[in-house]
Swiss-Prot record:
It comes from Photorhabdus laumondii subsp. laumondii (strain DSM 15139 / CIP 105565 / TT01). The lineage of its organism: Bacteria, Pseudomonadati, Pseudomonadota, Gammaproteobacteria, Enterobacterales. GO terms for cellular component: cytosol. Keywords: Lyase, Magnesium, Manganese, Metal-binding, Riboflavin biosynthesis. This is 3,4-dihydroxy-2-butanone 4-phosphate synthase. Homodimer. The keyword Magnesium applies. It is an enzyme of class 4 (lyase).
Amino acid sequence: MNQTLLSEYGTSSERVEHAINALRDGKGVMVLDNEDRENEGDIIFAAETMTVEQMALTIRYGSGIVCLCLTEERRQQLQLPMMVENNSSPFQTAFTVTIEAAQGVTTGVSAADRITTIRAAIADNAKPSDLNRPGHVFPLRAQPGGVLVRQGHTEAAIDLVSLAGFKPAGVLCELTNDDGSMARTLEVVQFAKLHNMPVVTIEDLVIYRQAIEQKAS
């Protein structure tokens, strides 16, 4: 990871704190994984606070695959089958079947419709019949234990929104460049500056969580 590009966002722990505070303020954050992993930056929002405008921005600048990160408990509550029985993807990305709100949407593709679907999925009393399958929102199941178990954007989203005091549900989408290629560290930092978002790495979050657990033990 190019630490020079990230140094203006503070130390490792400060970057995590900035991200937590941004989420509390209803803003988005940029999360980078390691260069030897996916080497991608994801736009992440707390599912509870994400607005239609923020969804529109995410669709406009992201890959278009907008994912809803959920816990295993929530996946079971919604009775969402995993997308495949045997996951052969290199990083074991845990997609479930795709979803759409059963009510209040048209085609399900618009920013407003995707927010409606997310709201339906994370409602406290949500039940399987509240969602149609397939749809235009891609749920991801996070590993219990978060980034301390799997250093993925899915787990980072759940950890960050939980640290910010929200229910464990986050929305993410990979940032792409204008030519459709994946944004790397430099482009992620440029985008973050333009849209007033903090930047944090998954490695930062691992160190932060390890420190919390060490203090607690």
